[in-house]
Amino acid sequence: MMRHNLSGTGIAIVTPFLEGGGVDFIGLEKLLNHIIEGGVDYIVVLGTTGESVVLSADEKIAVTNFVKETVDGRKPLVMGIGGNNTCAVSDTIKNTDLSGYDAILSVSPYYNKPTQEGIYQHYKALSANSPLPIILYNVPGRTSSNISAETTLRLANDFDNIIAVKEASGDMYQIMKIIKYRPEGFLVISGDDGLTLPMIYMGADGVISVVGQAYPKEFSNMVRYALEGNQKVANKLHLSLIHI
């Protein structure tokens, strides 16, 4: 059921700020209602787009609680929890109130440039400490290290609570390899708005989008039509959005 609920269009929401530097909760409420009314399938909080790395611990708690209360069960919620310190990320997962959330999105370790075995061991530790399903997040343009197809597939096969990968490598050969050899039920999610349609046509399950929060109806319709096999309408919507 959870795997099904996280297909389609997820939105990695921004964290709006006031001029003085605090979180703009009025703006955040408007954004949440806007994307829900636009028909998106689920919402991702504290991802890269949400500027999680610059939020204080108190701000993260305030934002995740506010989102949970505002959404109030209308859409599944995913919380971003990641970092390059395996012990620290594991402790954060164990000590965070995850009630009301359906999964964790965890970016691969950055800066340290771990080996593939190091990446595997990192996620193995997170899997052991997480009460929620985990979505791997591969974005080598930001982390400086790629999760190879082999490592993604190894994690997908070895740990039942690692249920998906958000793939933002831009490497279509790698992505197709994951799609071809993934275990049943493992989701492949686009992490690149511009590659969403070709990835779905290759067998991917949807997207965690940024631009979709500005155009939630158009973007979620594009994904929905593509997943249903209506390429003509999906292509038309894609071309109308490609300039953004």
Model-inferred region functions:
Residues 1-2, 239:
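Intrinsic low-complexity, intrinsically disordered segments enriched in polar/basic residues
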Residues 242-244:
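Conserved small/polar residues in nucleotide/adenosyl-binding loops
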Residues 142-239:
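Catalytic alpha/beta core domains of metabolic enzymes, predominantly
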Residues 3-11, 15-144:
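Active-site beta->alpha loop and helix N-cap motifs at the rims of alpha/beta catalytic domains
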